[in-house]
Amino acid sequence: MALTSYICFNCRNSYRLKTSLRNFSTTRPYRDLLRPATAPKPTPDVKHIRQNADLYAQNCIDRNYVAHAGHPSKIQQLSEEARQLDHDLKTPRSRIKQLEKTIAKLHIATRQGTDGNTNEKDLSPSEELAELKSEAQRLKDDSQSMTERKATCTEEINRLALSLPNLSSPFTPIGHDPTLVQYLNFNAQEPPTWTRQSPTELQARSHVTIGTELKLLDFTSSATTTGWGWYFLINEGAMLEQALVQYALSTARRRGWKTVAPPSIVYSYIAEACGFQPRDAHNEQQIWSIEQNERDKNTKPQRSLTGTAEIPLAAMYAGRDMNASELPIKLVGASRCYRAEAGSRGVDTKGLYRVHEFTKVELFGWADSVDGAVPSSDDMFNELLDMQMEILTALNLPCRVLEMPSGDLGASATRKRDIEALFPSRLRAASGGAATPVDPEIHYLESAWGEVTSASICTDYQSRRLAARVRGGGAKESRFPHTVNGTAMAVPRVLAAILENGWDAERGVVVIPEVLRPWMDGMESIGRS
């Protein structure tokens, strides 16, 4: 009978894969997540953290991880304790070996009927054996206790190290205020005419109003079927979504990015390895997990809905070795994304700007981390930005590019740039207590900007947690590659921006960007039926 390559999950869970290329974790839960033997074993850079504890502590403060600021010094303490335990174990282990040899000789002497006693207490062989065995057992108990404590220290060191955010790049502004890099399709000296419209006129320019009137959006039905945070795209609205996806994919393919259709469900430990936590710093739910029955909770790893295709695209190479000749690896994938968005308030909750389920096209790349690598992760980061700016410029959306501050980087990124578009519907939320304006010259527009894309460098943060390595390429040792990721198209937000910025009130139509028309049956505008 022919054998297939299929192995059931329970067998995989009990069978350790035999490979010299990758070590996997044990089945012990890590941070309350069941991890099977096939799960990638994370490898934090404990040595670098231990040697630069002050740097990591300050980085935690800069990045809003204040509760983690004590972890680096704790890692130092635990490392010293583990080192001392390792030293202290040498004496009892050596003594145990001596005792075992002596005990063996006494056993032989006893069987041969000779007197093998060498003790000064003039004990009988049986008495000496009992005494030696007692000492050996005591030393073994002490050794076991120290060994277990050392293992506990090592486990705690890894847990603390893995909880730390990535170090921020030299380009990253420290604090909470981003830095303006440039504008796209926007002149600060001549802002759009709608910026001078009344609140009533701005309300008429909202994508909710436009989309409902032109029968592109249906929030009434979604309120019945699913609730807040969902929507129906109908008629030309549904066509616009597909046009945006195809335009983003075609742009990426033209630049040599490989198309992937990824799953939208992953193991929860995979999402965590990529830097996505179930709850944010305010304990608000961010990721939806698939409910398990009581029997499965202790036998099967939990799964989660992905908030971005970044997670499954990164996981494609989890636990694998890449040859340097394979790099760079450039992937683009369209997927449905799911976000809890707990704690959202105000204008963000209206319409398409902040929703629970949406379509997004994501870019993800791997670059060699060795010095002099071509392309480097910085090169790929710049390629991502160029692509994002090309897409948004062609869509005729007024945008600004921001270098994001340390307080907005999350856990995995060392550097992040966001691109924000102008939304007329968000301008009406302006208030005197708004955040510090990025451009004081047009401070009154600050609330109207909304993020539509993001690009990040994660250095080796994700590859260390996903156990992905690079070999070859002139370097003797394997190393952890760098990862970059970015949004090619966040459909709901870009669609909303097109409706609001492309609205022609006099004609009662939305002008369709020229680059989308091939996927819109050649339509130039969407108007009233």
Model feature map: region roles:
Residues 2-195:
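N-terminal alpha-helical targeting/anchoring segments
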